[in-house]
């Protein structure tokens, strides 16, 4: 049963939502910080933490799962090399969400997601 297992819908069809989160995750891993809406930031946090946990595991199966999700293969290899030394002693909480001023056009709540 899937009680209490809600995923953020983000008002998008499933394929567009997955593509959006994959793109945001790739950009966050590459640049270290991303500015987006607060709802997208909360959804992005889950996916990014999952990728970093896979990188800390370091197994071949984990590497293949990460390559299947992140768009850039070289970025995955770099993440797997650096994750153990950067997040080795940390049990989750690899990202930080900082709220910023609302977007000027539609007044939606904005946030910056950054890697700790």
Swiss-Prot record:
Keyword list, A-Z: Ribonucleoprotein, Ribosomal protein
Entry GO terms, CC: cytosolic large ribosomal subunit
GO molecular function: structural constituent of ribosome
Biological process terms in GO annotation: translation
The keyword DNA-binding appears for this protein: no
Family: Belongs to the bacterial ribosomal protein bL17 family.
NCBIfam families, sorted: L17
Subunit text: Part of the 50S ribosomal subunit. Contacts protein L32.
Protein name: Large ribosomal subunit protein bL17
Organism: Prochlorococcus marinus (strain NATL2A)
């Amino acid at each position: 049963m899937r009680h209490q297992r809600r995923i953020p819908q983000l008002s998008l069809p499933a394929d567009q939502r997955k593509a959006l989160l994959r793109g945001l995750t790739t950009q966050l891993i590459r640049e270290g910080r991303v500015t987006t809406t607060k709802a997208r930031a909360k959804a992005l946090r889950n996916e990014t933490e999952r990728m970093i946990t896979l990188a800390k595991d370091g197994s071949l199966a984990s590497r293949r799962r990460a390559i299947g999700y992140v768009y850039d293969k070289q970025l995955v290899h770099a993440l797997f090399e650096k994750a153990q030394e950067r997040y080795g002693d940390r049990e989750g909480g690899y990202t930080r969400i900082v709220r910023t001023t609302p977007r000027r056009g539609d007044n939606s709540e904005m946030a910056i997601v950054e890697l700790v």
